[in-house]
């Protein structure tokens, strides 16, 4: 039986931490910053941890 392939689109967008959590960039960060407060812009700079219900799905895509 052949090996399962990693979904390349998901591999470019998500990273798995050492403990198995999945990190991704925040949404709403490409443009239109004039409508956001300074606090919103600052908080969007970091990375986000994917919520628990979606983790299993992303692990299947990433084959980890």
Curated annotation (Swiss-Prot):
What InterPro entries does this protein's entry cite?
A: Ribosomal_bL35, Ribosomal_bL35-like, Ribosomal_bL35_CS, Ribosomal_bL35_sf
Keyword Ribonucleoprotein in the entry? The reply is: yes
Q: Which PROSITE patterns match?
A: RIBOSOMAL_L35
Q: Which SUPFAM superfamilies match?
A: L35p-like (SSF143034)
Q: Which Pfam families match?
A: Ribosomal_L35p (PF01632)
Q: Which NCBIfam families match?
A: rpmI_bact
Q: Which family does it belong to?
A: Belongs to the bacterial ribosomal protein bL35 family.
Q: What is this protein called?
A: Large ribosomal subunit protein bL35
In its UniProt entry, the species of origin is given as Lactiplantibacillus plantarum (strain ATCC BAA-793 / NCIMB 8826 / WCFS1) (Lactobacillus plantarum)
Q: Which gene encodes it?
A: rpmI
